[in-house]
Amino acid sequence: MKRTYQPNKRKRQKVHGFRKRMSTKNGRRVLASRRRKGRKVISA
């Protein structure tokens, strides 16, 4: 059986990237909560 995580930079950005987060209201909420928490990295 192959492993479930098959790294792919492009897909990672397309699904979890900053621009993807900014493109929806809930995505912006995610960024806001991560900023509020003080995360060093706010998106992939």
From Swiss-Prot:
Ranges for the region named Disordered are 1-44
Family matches, as InterPro entries = Ribosomal_bL34, Ribosomal_bL34_CS
What UniProt keywords apply to this chain's record, in alphabetical order?
Ribonucleoprotein, Ribosomal protein
Q: Name one GO molecular function term.
A: structural constituent of ribosome
Q: Does the keyword Cell wall biogenesis/degradation apply?
A: no
- Domain of life here? Bacteria
Which Gene Ontology terms describe the biological processes this protein takes part in? translation
Task: List, alphabetically, the GO terms of the cellular component aspect.
Answer: ribonucleoprotein complex; ribosome
Q: Does the keyword Ribonucleoprotein apply?
A: yes
State the family named in the UniProt similarity comment for this chain.
Answer: Belongs to the bacterial ribosomal protein bL34 family.
- The protein depicted here goes by the name Large ribosomal subunit protein bL34
Gene this protein is translated from:
rpmH
